A protein has these predicted regions:
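N-terminal subdomain of nucleotide-sugar transferases
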Residues: 1-64, 167, 238, 405
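Conserved donor-binding/catalytic core segment of Leloir-type glycosyltransferases
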Residues: 4, 169, 208-226, 232-236
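Carbohydrate-associated surface elements
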Residues: 174, 194
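A charged, aromatic-enriched C-terminal amphipathic alpha-helix characteristic of glycosyltransferases
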Residues: 344-351, 357-389
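Acidic donor-binding loop of glycosyltransferase active sites
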Residues: 288-304, 317
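Membrane-proximal helix-turn-helix segments that form the acceptor-binding/catalytic region
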Residues: 23-24, 89, 122-125, 129-133, ...
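Acidic anion/phosphate-binding donor-loop and adjacent secondary structure
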Residues: 63, 67, 150-152, 195-212
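Nucleotide-activated donor-binding/catalytic signature segment of Leloir-type glycosyltransferases, i.e.
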Residues: 246-256, 260-285, 337
Length: 405
């Protein structure tokens, strides 16, 4: 297959949004398919073309859309709502420039199918425009919760705007069922994101920290400040149950996009002296942190699927979710031998930390890791693309009769 992937976040960024399409592109190239990826500018670099790895899609890096920053929060919400539901002059100008740059960089390459991530409308607008010109099907990657990215009252309107998509993909059963509400009759395929090799290497190595320090790792987003405060409050209370010697060995580590929020919350709980808080770090460094921690934790939101759990489970050290988790995630945890628990309140979290502090770290001699690599999950994605291409309803008619908005 000849495939064009469109995602506004460059794969060299340290954000999870830049990984999914790029990793699947590499997996499909290894299967013999041709894949080109259109993306946003590389961090600190202008737009252009290139590749980032030996086996990787050709990258077409577009300039970011130019939008005027509104000082008023109300006006920012209004502008965002308008941008989701209809094009404005700035959007049209960007779309024309992006189309021209993409066509110029593609040369003679003509995709049979386009796959675009929904994080904002720009990727979908470009995918729809190119699909119409080439009379090929395009697919929306609704990897996240459709309702989280669209305000109430706009969700169905935005879905109708992009109804010409031949189908959708979703990163969890939770997100798939939500997408089905707004795209009735459309095929919505479940395609989990994969786990990168550094986490498998961490599992094979086992716990090897000889420093004497024992690290509690917090990963991912913090979502609600109230939940973060409960989590850190439980840690502060638990620390008081340890001996002075054990307290001196303890470190709390966070590396992620919410580092400012975590720093402020940790200060409020008197934990800054035992905390190391930084922005996001590369995956191999994160995997090493998981390997050398006595426990990895994350904060649960009922509105999303936490793909980070799969990475933590593969790495092999104990994992605790706070203050809940979906059945879908618990089922993943049951597929491997990594210790996993859901702490639903302060007392439960303190109990889990006490048990894990007293337990021996996980060794490298254990059951084989689950098959959750990007290449493993590419099986379903490849089959879905092939089914869309073979469907009589996927191409042409929907594109030609749609009025562009």
């Amino acid at each position: 297959m000849r495939l064009l992937f469109i995602n506004e976040t460059h794969p060299d960024s340290r954000h999870v949004a830049g990984m999914r399409l790029n990793r699947f592109a590499t997996a499909l190239i290894e299967r013999g398919h041709e894949v080109v990826q259109v993306t946003g500018p590389a961090p600190g670099h202008p737009s252009g073309t290139g590749t980032t790895h030996d086996v990787a899609p050709k990258l077409i890096s577009l300039a970011a859309p130019v939008t005027r920053e509104e000082k008023s929060a109300v006006m920012r919400r209004v502008k965002t709502a308008l941008r989701l539901t209809r094009s404005d002059r700035a959007t049209d100008e960007w779309l024309n420039l992006a189309r021209g740059q993409t066509l110029g960089a593609l040369g003679d390459f003509r995709p049979q199918l386009i796959w675009a991530t929904f994080g904002n409308v720009y990727s979908l607008l470009l995918a729809r425009r190119l699909a119409r010109e080439w009379a090929c099907p395009w697919i929306i990657d609704a990897k996240d919760n459709w309702e989280s990215f669209n305000r109430r009252g706009l969700r169905a309107i935005v879905a109708r705007r992009f109804a010409s998509a031949a189908g959708l993909t979703a990163n969890s059963r939770l997100h798939r069922e939500i997408a089905k509400r707004y795209f009735p009759g459309s095929a919505v395929e479940l395609v989990y994101s994969g786990v990168a090799e550094p986490f498998y290497r961490a599992r094979r190595a086992g716990h090897q920290d000889q420093s004497g320090t024992r690290t509690l790792l917090l990963v991912g987003g913090t979502y609600r400040r109230a939940i973060l405060d409960q989590y850190l409050g439980a840690i502060a209370d638990w620390l008081q149950t340890l001996s002075a010697t054990d307290q001196a060995r303890f470190r709390l580590r966070y590396a992620g996009a919410d580092h400012d929020v975590v720093t402020d919350a940790a200060a409020a709980k008197g934990l800054l002296a035992v905390a190391d808080i930084t922005p996001a770090i590369p995956l191999d460094a994160l995997a090493d942190l998981v390997r050398t921690s006595f426990c990895a934790t994350y904060l649960w939101s009922p509105h999303t699927f936490h793909h980070k759990l799969l990475e933590l489970l593969v790495a092999g050290q104990a994992v605790v979710a706070f203050p809940g988790e979906h059945a879908e995630s618990v089922e993943f945890a049951a597929q491997c031998d990594t210790p996993f628990a859901v702490a639903r309140d302060r007392a439960s979290l303190i109990e889990q930390l006490s048990l894990l502090w007293a337990a021996a770290p996980q060794s490298a001699t254990r059951r084989a890791a689950p098959r959750w690599r990007w290449g493993d999950f590419a099986d379903g994605l490849e089959a879905f693309f092939e089914a869309i291409l073979s469907s009589k309803h996927s191409a042409g008619d929907k594109q030609r009769h749609e009025v562009e908005r």
